[in-house]
């Protein structure tokens, strides 16, 4: 297991949930359910309200692989929109182009999806893009660059992930043409993110 895998394993154990949505971390949590450095049934330190909010914020930050600045900007945009700020926050993160690549099964992880976008493998509405943080909207279409080796890679990823995760109803995936159409913005119950978004809103609201 490489250093990055070890670090992800520690994060999963710290949060107590599989934020990376990969089977190996479910197995890890069953084997080692306690946070790193805590053995057996050691008593947990009481967490303050601020501490709880921070944990929820960190969950989302590491789930989507975004920086602190990026997450702060997403919160500001979510607050400007109509509706529930917490729901808006998660919906904006879900509609990042790297997350769409991941949800569609074109990549085995979000980190891999970011690489795919950064390397110019994805075409958005007919134009090549290299920015993983682009937010997609209804009727946007992404597809894989016309290159046999790239298509072979993505098809292999689709095959690997097909039994691991369910395709969301708010995107339409054509596995043959290797394209994805955004149908609509996802509702909260369609987002499997394991975090309390209201606590994240409270965290940022106190710092606004």
UniProtKB/Swiss-Prot annotation:
Residues 95-157 form the S4 RNA-binding domain. GO terms for cellular component: small ribosomal subunit. Part of the 30S ribosomal subunit. Contacts protein S5. The interaction surface between S4 and S5 is involved in control of translational fidelity. NCBIfam families: PRK05327.1 (NF003717), rpsD_bact (TIGR01017). One of the primary rRNA binding proteins, it binds directly to 16S rRNA where it nucleates assembly of the body of the 30S subunit. With S5 and S12 plays an important role in translational accuracy. Belongs to the universal ribosomal protein uS4 family. This is Small ribosomal subunit protein uS4. It comes from Borrelia duttonii (strain Ly).
């Amino acid at each position: 297991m490489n250093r990055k895998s070890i670090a992800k394993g520690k994060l999963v154990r710290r949060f107590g949930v599989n934020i990376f949505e990969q089977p190996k971390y479910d197995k890890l949590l069953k084997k080692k359910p306690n946070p790193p450095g805590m053995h057996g049934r050691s008593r947990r330190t009481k967490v303050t309200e601020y501490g709880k909010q921070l944990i929820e914020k960190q969950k989302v930050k590491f789930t989507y692989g975004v920086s602190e600045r990026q997450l702060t900007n997403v919160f500001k945009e979510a607050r400007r929109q109509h509706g529930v700020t917490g729901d808006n926050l998660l919906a904006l993160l879900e509609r990042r182009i790297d997350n769409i690549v991941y949800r569609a099964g074109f990549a085995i992880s979000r980190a891999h999806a970011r690489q795919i976008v950064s390397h110019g493998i994805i075409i958005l509405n007919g134009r090549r893009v290299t920015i993983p943080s682009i937010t997609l909207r209804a009727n946007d279409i992404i597809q894989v660059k016309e290159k046999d080796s790239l298509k072979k890679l993505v098809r292999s990823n689709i095959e690997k992930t097909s039994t691991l995760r369910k395709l969301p109803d708010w995107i339409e995936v054509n596995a043959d043409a290797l394209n994805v159409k955004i149908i609509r913005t996802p509702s909260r119950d369609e987002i499997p993110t394991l975090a309390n978004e209201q606590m994240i809103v409270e965290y940022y609201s106190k710092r606004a």
